[in-house]
Regions:
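A conserved ligand/cofactor-binding region detector
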Residues: 1-750
Length: 750
């Protein structure tokens, strides 16, 4: 295939081509092959609308799904070239931030692989979130241009007029083909405008937020610490849903829809609250077509479904009416009508769409005017029903359902850990590639020492590969015989990276005191903090200070290393996850809706160190609690602390020398000598005077359980059994299973 591709594009042999030319030729050929595959069809079509799609690099993923990966790799190897090196040329699409976007990407893969008729709809961000740089142990943000002249983006002739208050813009739709595993293709539709001006971004990621026609699709989640930034988010969200709604109605009509039967032709999944305005926008468009308000509302309610991803109040969006009047005045009469109908039916002001502060609650609109509300892990859904959305659950119990998240095994095993995938195939065949529950067959090898030793060797090889990568990219040398303890996820206080770095401080102090671990420990972090999230950036500062302090201390560094991976993204996750021994999933119980990193680590043979939060609950049920390290207060206890407002972090600090020593070290002379006093003191005071996510509540138990995990690691056969149990029981967490459940219970696509 490669020979023909480069000959067709450049008239050269493989040997005569640069890696860049080979990459460009493969991109063109793979795009053409994907376009030739039949599209998924059916009367009813799903539109998965999301502000984020963290899709990762696509070359190898598409080659795997098209059944060409082994052929291309072998052909390049025979010519003395490397597919891995060629893939390094590919920029990672910067279209997402964290779990929300990665989940959407996994879902698109599974929707296509299962042969379902469903496309993604989002925005074509030119600079994405941001590129993370470190200087003076602080995070700095720069723009992240990822769109090459040749890319997976296919410009279409589809465009729509989108009206805002006082102006109109014309969109342009770009498509990325979504290849199914040995199946048909779907599309990811990304909308943009051609008046975008990348040159308005000056220092870092600063730009004029009021220049909507120039900035609308520059960044994902523009800084919302001021009114201009918040307004820009409203403009972005409406631009996304207006295009989506126009596309949906156009395609539905082409399939024979009369609009009065829209729900028979269309299912819309609202992924978190960012696309919520699709509800009033569709009602607006349907009434403009002559439908009555009653009929339009009924049709939209039977078409839209909502996925809730969080119980954090900050993430349940509420937009001031003043913003909506300015940006999208045409929606306000409809939103007011929707709220009026809710008020006529219910006395409980908690369920109103417009609150007493004149803010529009997006989630409330989704619940009232959608036919399904789902959480993303068993515990999360139960918390929604029992407390956070209990008032709505009492009204609409039939709407609420759980869909535990999943991951695509094609990317997170076949692609990122081929040696492990090949080993599994040699043991149980390749049926697990399309039916992940077949991994359960691995359990019959749990006492086979030859298999267990091979599993340990595969893990060690992955650690060597990661060590080489970090040495080349960040100049940090790691010991592959050390324990790789990894926490990679969006930086947020509820995810408690601060607790992990307090453990690092504790271990540093122990080593300085002469108490050395039996085996060296490598603690690896990867995380970006939102530009305006001050405490999150302070936590990164502390991690970077500890990295400098620990790694340069000859007394400590042989036993402990700290690594903060710069500009963490999907590509780096693909290198980190296969090498992980201990997966850090330490969010405050009740706060993590699900998590999917926990599933990726499990599939790749890491053992979970975690709280009973999100999908950790189900992971420990499937793999067995004896094969994980569970600690911390339960969700019930945490929720009670919040209800009574009786958690005082200072109490825990004062009664424990272990906690006191670790926290005090944040403002010690050693750290202040290399860190920024303002950042460190602010974090220190936050932990002692607020600690909203209860770090100190669980810290002592975390230290004890983590030390036990490190001690247990020394029994290599016992540890390998834990690894095997995790891999064998990961099948439930395939996104194919999740999507089958969505389709059976919510979408009902043929």
């Amino acid at each position: 295939m490669v020979k023909e591709a480069v000959l067709k594009q450049y008239g050269k042999s493989i040997a005569e081509c640069t890696d860049r030319e080979i990459y460009d030729a493969l991109l063109t050929s793979v795009n053409e092959l994907a376009a030739q595959k039949e599209s998924n069809e059916g009367k009813r079509k799903l539109y998965y609308i999301s502000a984020e799609f963290l899709i990762g690099k696509l070359l190898s993923n598409n080659l795997i799904n098209l059944g060409l990966y082994d052929e291309v790799k072998a052909e390049l190897n025979a010519a003395g070239r490397s597919l891995a090196e060629i893939e390094e040329i590919e920029p990672e699409p910067s279209l997402g931030n964290g779990g929300l976007g990665r989940l959407a990407a996994c879902f698109l893969d599974s929707i296509a692989s299962l042969g379902l008729n469903g496309d993604g709809v989002g925005l074509n961000y030119h600079f994405g979130l941001f590129k993370q740089e470190f200087k003076d142990n602080l995070q700095y943000e720069t723009k992240n241009p990822w769109i090459d002249k040749k890319s997976w983006l296919n410009k279409t002739d589809v465009s729509y007029k989108v009206k805002f208050g006082g102006m109109e813009v014309t969109s342009r739709m770009y498509d990325i083909l979504v290849t199914g595993y040995n199946n048909r293709t779907n599309k990811l539709h990304l909308f943009d405008i051609e008046t975008i001006d990348e040159s308005i971004v000056k220092e870092g990621i600063d730009f004029d937020k009021a220049e909507i026609k120039k900035n609308l699709t520059l960044f994902l989640y523009p800084d919302d610490s001021d009114e201009a930034g918040r307004l820009l988010r409203v403009y972005q969200q409406y631009f996304m849903v207006s295009n989506a709604a126009q596309l949906i109605l156009k395609e539905a009509k082409e399939r024979g829809c009369k609009l009065t039967d829209l729900h028979e032709y269309v299912a819309i999944q609202i992924n978190d609250t960012h696309p919520s305005m699709v509800i009033p926008e569709l009602i607006r468009l349907l009434t403009a077509e002559g439908m009555s308000m009653d009929a339009a509302i009924k049709e939209v309610t039977n078409t839209c479904a909502y996925t809730n991803h969080t119980i954090l109040a900050e993430a349940l969006e509420k937009w001031p009416i003043a913003y909506l009047k300015k940006a999208v005045p045409q929606l306000m009469p409809i939103i007011k009508e929707l709220d009026k109908r809710v008020r006529a039916k219910f006395d409980d002001e908690i369920v109103y769409i417009i609150d007493e502060d004149d803010r529009v609650h997006m989630a409330h609109m989704d619940i009232h005017y959608g036919y399904s509300v789902n959480g993303v892990a068993y515990l999360h859904t139960e918390i929604l029903k029992d407390s956070e959305l209990n008032n709505f659950y009492k009204i609409y119990p039939e709407k609420f359902n759980n869909k535990t998240n999943g991951i695509t095994f094609r990317r997170w095993l076949l692609h990122c850990n081929a040696p492990l995938a090949d080993f599994i195939t040699s043991l149980i065949g390749d049926g697990y590639k399309t039916d992940a529950t077949e991994l359960k067959k691995l359990e019959k090898f749990v006492d086979d020492e030859k298999v267990l030793n091979e599993l340990l060797e595969i893990k060690k090889d992955a650690k060597i590969e990661l060590s080489n990568y970090l040495s080349e990219t960040q100049g940090i040398e790691l010991d592959e015989n050390s324990i790789f303890d990894i926490q990679i996820k969006r930086l947020h206080e509820y995810k408690r990276q601060q607790m992990n770095v307090l453990y690092v401080i504790h271990k540093y102090l122990e080593i300085k005191d002469g108490k050395k671990p039996a085996r060296p420990i490598t603690v690896i972090f990867g995380a970006k903090a939102a530009p305006a999230y001050v405490i999150a950036k302070d936590i990164i500062h502390l991690i970077l200070c500890m990295q400098e302090l620990v790694n340069n201390d000859p007394e400590v560094s042989p036993y402990l290393k700290v690594v903060m991976v710069k500009n963490y993204n999907v590509t780096k996750a693909e290198k980190l996850i296969p090498a992980c021994d201990i997966s850090e999933q330490i969010s405050l119980a009740s706060k993590e809706a699900s998590g999917t990193g926990n599933m990726k680590f499990m599939l790749n043979g890491a053992v979970t160190l975690g709280t009973l939060d999100g999908a950790n609950v189900e992971i420990s049920q499937f793999a067995g609690k004896e094969n994980e390290y569970i600690f911390g207060k339960t969700a019930d206890v945490v929720i009670e602390h919040y209800a009574k407002a009786d958690y005082v972090s200072m109490d825990y600090y004062e009664k424990s020398d272990v906690i006191k020593d670790a926290v005090d070290f944040i403002v010690s002379d050693e750290l202040l000598a290399i860190g920024n006093e303002e950042n460190l003191e602010r974090l220190y005071n936050e932990l002692l005077n607020k600690d909203w996510f209860m770090t100190l509540l669980d810290l002592e138990e975390y230290i004890k359980v983590k030390d036990k995990a490190f001690a247990d690691y020394e029994d290599r056969m016992s540890w390998a059994k834990k690894m095997l149990h995790n891999i064998a029981n990961a099948g439930f967490f395939s996104s194919d299973r999740t999507i089958e459940e969505y389709n059976k219970d919510i979408w009902k696509l043929s």
